[in-house]
Amino acid sequence: MTAARTSAAKSRPRSRRGEGESLRDDLLAATERLMIETGSADAVSIRAIADAVGVTPPSIYLHFPDKNSLILAVCERHFEEFDAVVEAAGKSTHDPVESLRRRGRAYVRFGLENPEPYRILFMTRAEGARQYDILAGAGGRAFQHLVDAVQRCIDAGAFRPADPVFAATGVWTAVHGVTSLLISLPGFPWPDVDAIVDHVCEIQIRGLSQTFDEPEEPS
């Protein structure tokens, strides 16, 4: 261990009884900050997190068994907040199509009002088992709520019969595309943001509402 790291590790006094939760929060905050700075969960190391908080790596393992658990905890916390915001918007009306439209608006608004958490959830690279764990956990619940919203539109006859998972994936990619562009290119001369979001949502809704003729068999 270098002298600098030794100094950093000693800079945080030993937690008193009952202060472990404070250290846990500090670890999550440092992990989140490093993920944003590096743009990749893979680039964040236990050593870097320990140095940022001013503790030794073994102190981290008292709260999290490995780096993957830290990354998941950060993502789950933001996914829960994100899901609550979008769900509240969707439940503000009984009309299933308007509910889906409001979910789309809330999705984009969350990203614009919380760009750094949004980057962590949807714009940092996560691969392999970690990505599966995140999507199957809190992220999976958020996506299932979108699938359910699409299914309600189908059940009401507003959308043509379709695979709700496939349809929801299309809606997600559309609103994510708008959100990520707005976050990544703030200097671009965008037209009215609300109008853009409504336009994209309307394209998705109309596409799912239309009945397409079956293509003719080639002669």
For each feature predicted by the language model, list its residue ranges:
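Amphipathic, non-transmembrane alpha-helical scaffold segments
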Residues: G20, R24, I71, C75, ...
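Hydrophobic/aromatic-rich alpha-helical bundle segments in the mid-to-C-terminal region
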Residues: A129-A136, G140, I154-E202, T211-S219
